[in-house]
């Protein structure tokens, strides 16, 4: 699947510190690397394309864009993979409700997502993979789990073909056989897991499962649903196995960082890690990093609630995407926070001040190759669990002095924060 154009990231001289991230599985901050050889891999779960990109989505993708920029500044070789869940129940339900073909709806929303990401100057993935592009590979992985005894069938009376059965992942068997055990990634207790499973696409009450928390690997074909012929019969993939297979196909093992919103900690990231470990006998990732939830009008912003602030609508209203980006960067990526008009207005004013600060950079006498104290301090803030609010505060304080920026400082704001000063975005 095609991604979106990559913005130019300036190179800035100097010796950036080793970046760190909060690892959900460890409950602490740790280096955002695995091997120390300068090669890093990032997998971030992508959209289910049934509605437009809202500020909550943008906040998550910007968090991991910032991680990439910090890695690149450090000189690392970065491989970034993102999926698109372009066949799933919410997409099919929206397509049915609106009377459009699910494939057309997915294509339309993916294109809008690309446009929003390009406008926000989010670095694109090196591999942008739709689930429909890897159905055969997912089915082969499910077949392998069946062969190993970590997958099993469950009676499916409503299957389109008599005798066809859904396939589930046996969490107890996987935990006994490999490096992963249920709860390793999330740290949640079983009661919390059961509640979240029911809330987030699981089916803990389904009869015939060995454990209520066992997740779906393969959904047998139902009437009027898309299905593919495969090694495990006609049907379509379950949610968690899709990401495990795509990551294992596209990235070195273990993945350096598995990223996404905090609402993916369980069941999605927990189970993806379990599937990958069952297939490889190895831990899936070194760091599990999660962004906080964004609220609007007092509730978590979500498609199901409809309380959305859409990036495309802000852009259509004339808001500079750089101001949107600064509004998001002003929040720590792990924090839960609420979007307000006042927050956006503050960022519009900040952008104007920064643009003015940068306007005379070309006329300064400072050596463009020497980053200086400000750039090093910004690097230190970003290396400390992506402390973008701290980095912004440092820049605000410098701007307030009235001393013009140096060319290297302007380049560093672009390279590290993705804000091209003096260059209004479309």
Swiss-Prot record:
Binds 1 zinc ion per subunit. A motif ('ERGGDP' region) lies at residues 199-204. It catalyses: 1D-myo-inositol 2-amino-2-deoxy-alpha-D-glucopyranoside + L-cysteine + ATP = 1D-myo-inositol 2-(L-cysteinylamino)-2-deoxy-alpha-D-glucopyranoside + AMP + diphosphate + H(+). It is an enzyme of class 6 (ligase). One of its GO terms (biological process) is cysteinyl-tRNA aminoacylation. A motif ('HIGH' region) lies at residues 47-57. This is L-cysteine:1D-myo-inositol 2-amino-2-deoxy-alpha-D-glucopyranoside ligase.
């Amino acid at each position: 699947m095609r991604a979106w154009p990559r913005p130019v990231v300036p190179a800035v001289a100097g010796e950036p510190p080793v970046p760190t991230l909060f690892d959900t599985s460890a409950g602490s901050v740790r280096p955002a690397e695995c091997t120390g050889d300068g090669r890093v891999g990032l997998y971030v779960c992508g959209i289910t394309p049934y509605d437009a990109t809202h500020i909550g989505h943008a906040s998550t993708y910007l968090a991991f864009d910032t991680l990439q920029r910090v890695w690149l500044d450090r000189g690392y070789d970065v491989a970034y993979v993102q999926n698109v869940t372009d066949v799933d129940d919410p997409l099919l339900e929206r397509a049915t409700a609106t009377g459009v073909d699910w494939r057309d709806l997915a294509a339309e929303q993916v294109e809008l997502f690309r446009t929003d990401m390009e406008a926000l100057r989010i670095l694109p993935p090196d591999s942008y993979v739709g689930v429909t592009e890897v159905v055969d590979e997912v089915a082969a992985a499910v077949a392998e789990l069946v062969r190993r005894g970590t997958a099993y069938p469950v009676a499916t009376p409503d299957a389109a073909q008599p005798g066809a059965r859904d396939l589930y992942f046996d969490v107890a068997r996987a935990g006994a056989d490999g490096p992963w055990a249920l709860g390793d990634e999330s740290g949640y207790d079983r009661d919390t897991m059961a509640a979240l499973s029911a809330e987030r696409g699981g089916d803990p009450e389904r009869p015939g499962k060995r454990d209520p928390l066992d997740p779906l690997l393969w959904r047998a074909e139902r009437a009027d649903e898309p299905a593919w012929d495969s090694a495990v019969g006609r049907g379509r993939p379950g949610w968690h196995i899709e990401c495990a297979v795509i990551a294992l196909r596209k990235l070195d093992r273990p993945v350096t960082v598995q990223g996404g919103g905090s609402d993916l900690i369980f069941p999605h990231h927990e189970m993806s890690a379990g599937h990958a470990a069952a297939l490889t006998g190895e831990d899936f990732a070194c760091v599990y990093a999660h962004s906080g939830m964004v609220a609007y009008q007092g509730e978590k912003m979500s498609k199901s609630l409809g309380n959305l602030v859409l990036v495309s609508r802000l852009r259509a209203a004339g808001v500079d995407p750089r101001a949107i980006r600064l509004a998001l960067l002003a929040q720590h990526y792990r924090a839960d926070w609420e979007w307000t008009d006042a927050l956006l207005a503050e960022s519009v004013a900040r952008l104007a001040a920064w643009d003015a600060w940068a306007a005379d950079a070309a006329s300064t006498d400072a050596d463009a190759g020497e980053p200086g104290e400000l750039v090093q301090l910004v690097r230190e803030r970003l290396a400390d669990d992506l402390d973008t609010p701290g980095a912004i505060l440092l820049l605000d304080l410098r701007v307030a002095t009235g001393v013009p920026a140096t060319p290297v400082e302007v380049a560093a704001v672009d390279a590290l924060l993705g804000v091209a000063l003096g260059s209004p975005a479309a």
